UniProtKB/Swiss-Prot annotation:
Subunit organization: Forms homodimers. Interacts with ubiquitin-protein ligase UBE3A/E6-AP and thus forms a complex with human TP53. Interacts with human NFX1 and MAGI3. Interacts with human IRF3; this interaction inhibits the establishment of antiviral state. Interacts with human TYK2; this interaction inhibits JAK-STAT activation by interferon alpha. Interacts with host DLG1; this interaction leads to the proteasomal degradation of DLG1.
Keywords: Activator, DNA-binding, Early protein, Host cytoplasm, Host nucleus, Host-virus interaction, Inhibition of host innate immune response by virus, Inhibition of host IRF3 by virus, Inhibition of host RLR pathway by virus, Metal-binding, Modulation of host cell apoptosis by virus, Oncogene, Transcription, Transcription regulation, Viral immunoevasion, Zinc, Zinc-finger
Record's protein name: Protein E6
BP term (GO), one: symbiont-mediated suppression of host cytoplasmic pattern recognition receptor signaling pathway via inhibition of IRF3 activity
Species of the source: Human papillomavirus 33
Function of the molecule: This protein may be involved in the oncogenic potential of this virus (cervical neoplasia-associated virus). Plays a major role in the induction and maintenance of cellular transformation. Acts mainly as an oncoprotein by stimulating the destruction of many host cell key regulatory proteins. E6 associates with host UBE3A/E6-AP ubiquitin-protein ligase, and inactivates tumor suppressors TP53 and TP73 by targeting them to the 26S proteasome for degradation. In turn, DNA damage and chromosomal instabilities increase and lead to cell proliferation and cancer development.
Length: 149
């Protein structure tokens, strides 16, 4: 479909324009499990501002299940350290509102209110592979569940 790396759209919005379709009609497969993305997953992909990836010139997204799984694997393999909001601002030398911080679970960019919530509740931000992570409002309440034996 897209052979030249220069012409490959990187965002879902740009891909829709290139294919002359809309976000409501585009069909993508998951890059990991190869299953077609459900409509809600396409919307989540766009809302999370994730990047379209290409395999053999074909565009792929990622389904919710694979995204959460890969996020957890990345956390386990590439966790560096955690800091409080004030320390993060001093380290990066930028205010929190200018720092890209994604949700550690669903990878959505955190809005200013979600970042403020971390500071107000004295919760830490995590450095994973050189990128900053916290929890969005939707994932805030979801906790790791222990399996009963």
């Amino acid at each position: 479909m897209f052979q030249d790396t220069e012409e490959k759209p990187r965002t879902l919005h740009d891909l829709c324009q290139a294919l002359e379709t809309t976000i409501h009609n585009i069909e993508l497969q998951c890059v990991e499990c190869k299953k077609p993305l459900q409509r809600s997953e396409v919307y989540d992909f766009a809302f999370a501002d994730l990047t379209v990836v290409y395999r053999e010139g074909n565009p792929f997204g990622i389904c919710k299940l694979c995204l959460r799984f890969l996020s957890k694997i990345s956390e386990y393999r590439h966790y560096n350290y955690s800091v409080y909001g004030n320390t993060l601002e001093q380290t990066v030398k930028k205010p929190l509102n200018e720092i890209l911080i994604r949700c550690i679970i669903c990878q959505r960019p955190l809005c200013p209110q979600e970042k403020k919530r971390h500071v107000d509740l004295n919760k830490r931000f995590h450095n994973i592979s050189g990128r900053w992570a916290g929890r969005c409002a939707a994932c805030w309440r979801s906790r790791r569940r222990e399996t009963a034996l």
